[in-house]
Amino acid sequence: MRKAFALLVIVASLSLFIPSAFPAYDSAAVKAAMEKLPQHMTDIQTKSAARDYYGAAEGFMEVARLIKKLDVIVPVKGEKAIWDQNHRNLINAAFKGIGACGAQNDAAIKEAIKELIKYRNESHKIFK
């Protein structure tokens, strides 16, 4: 009986602690990020087309920063593990874009942009 009571106390304590371990879903932050993302993507495309590789690299870094800020959020819809993996994929695609800018490789920049769009679309299918 004591074991059952102790287990009940532990479960009750954890149920109070675990929800506070992650921030609540911040729809305003997610919405603001999703409004900024297309702006950054347009900026990257414009700057890379003008062969402003430094400016395009800054745009890719802004995308990585934007997505990284959303890492702590627990999605209302979908699994947190998938949310985290998708964010890692988006950030890695942005880093590939930065590397492509450093190499002044227009084809690789376009591929990085396609990859960002792919992961953004996948994320929207799951979490939107």
Task: Place the predicted regions along the sequence by residue.
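General structural signal for alpha-helix termini and helix-helix connectors
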Residues: D43-A50, V72-V76, K96-A103
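Generic structural signal for well-ordered, non-transmembrane alpha-helical segments
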Residues: E35-P38, T42, M61-A64, K68, ...
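C-terminal amphipathic alpha-helix
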Residues: K96-K128
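Bacterial N-terminal signal peptides
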Residues: L8-F17
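Short, solvent-exposed, charged loop/turn and helix-capping segments
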Residues: L66-D84
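Immediate post-signal-peptide N-terminus of mature secreted/exported proteins
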Residues: F22-A57
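Bacterial N-terminal signal peptides that target proteins for export
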Residues: M1-V9
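Solenoid-repeat scaffolds in large eukaryotic assemblies
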Residues: G55-A57, V63, I109-K110
